[in-house]
């Protein structure tokens, strides 16, 4: 069997195929996917500003972390299953199901009367969100050749960036003027529009010959069960490590070890005949560059959430910005990812090489995160805005070029499993991108409190042992006298500095790994069993060509 790299070499010696061009249906599908991605992106960040108000209203206490983690957990653990479902039942119905699940979860969150109901709604939302974002990339991969894929990924990235940027802004505005419940109710009309749009235009091929029970037998039930259970165990450990339980406690170590052991067993089963249709075939990770891309996908995803969850802490507890103003102040970290993604996509399409893009992008991220360590009480608007722009531009370049690079090493028939694996790694990185800086932040806060950095014992008790993140708001700080405010702001500032000091190491390692990447030719033709349902002439026939013709 020929490898993708050898296929690329054969293409260079054969006549160039006619340039691929999208038609109306492709654009219509991209618009529909854009609306669904806007939904998912908004919900990823909308609570970064609104969280303190929501948590106080529902009296969640120490369980507040599950409002975020339930979303991450379900969106990550379900990805391999969604990828396999899309191969078995087709992209159309699985995507429509994901949108419906997301809207259902949003309704439950908006109507939540208890913390448990909110957490359950967030878990359901996460299932839909993970499916929406991952399936969008699978569908784009079915419709667009690898060499041109970056352009369409940039479109979705721009929408994700706009949604991520609007999330804190909308969340802050809604909390300040209406009710936090509309943070979730807003998804209902938008979700309805996206469902109708995709129902009309998303008509792509799938295997209609197999019976329902034949399709069910193809599902790797054991593999999916292990992945879900392992992800739950790891996230449970990370949720309470350093807050309810010490990192060295058996309450933390046992679920953490069980989770990683489960993932190790899962990886082993993927190489055996026990998995007739593996979720993540080991052939995806045979090339050294594939392994590097997987590691750097994890790191870049972790660094993104590192910033999204701790920049608001700096803005609200150190700069004393209101939720609405903090939402506006986060615009650079989200919006500057858009031109970064476009530059990365254009470079990928123009030269067909991802290594130079990754080197430059991770260099920018490392520089920007280093500048974040300069954050203090008197940091100017120009400083924090420019520093965010540097990190965001590099992150945008990484996002649009990492998946096409990872897909370059696999055949088109594996596109769904490959994309699901990549997104699983990425969302797994999001989980650690909250857990690692949170542990660093809490540890630094406790150390400073132990040194007597805050003179008022009641304040120290409030923000000790993991309470600092929940209390990170201007309203909390401003209720105290001026001298005590300065002490609180100083403690938060020093903790934030330590958080970003550690992030430099992660970005630096990723930068060094990019130097070891090897470029592989990106395919200019497309062979897929999941092309557009309605065949056209000329170029469209080439797009819909089947791998087994």
UniProtKB/Swiss-Prot annotation:
Belongs to the major facilitator superfamily. The gene is TwmF. It is a multi-pass membrane protein. GO terms for cellular component: plasma membrane. Coiled coil: none annotated. GO terms for molecular function: transmembrane transporter activity. Signal peptide: none annotated. Its main location: membrane. Pfam families: MFS_1. The keyword Magnesium does not apply. MFS efflux transporter; part of the gene cluster that mediates the biosynthesis of wortmanamides A and B, reduced long-chain polyketides amidated with a specific omega-amino acid, 5-aminopentanoic acid (5PA). The keyword Transferase does not apply. This is MFS-type transporter TwmF. Keywords: Glycoprotein, Membrane, Transmembrane, Transmembrane helix, Transport. The chain crosses the membrane at residues 29-49, 63-83, 99-119, 126-146, 155-175, 182-202, 221-241, 249-269, 291-311, 328-348, 355-375, 390-410, 421-441, 502-522. It comes from Talaromyces wortmannii. Glycans are attached at residue 151. It is found in: Membrane.
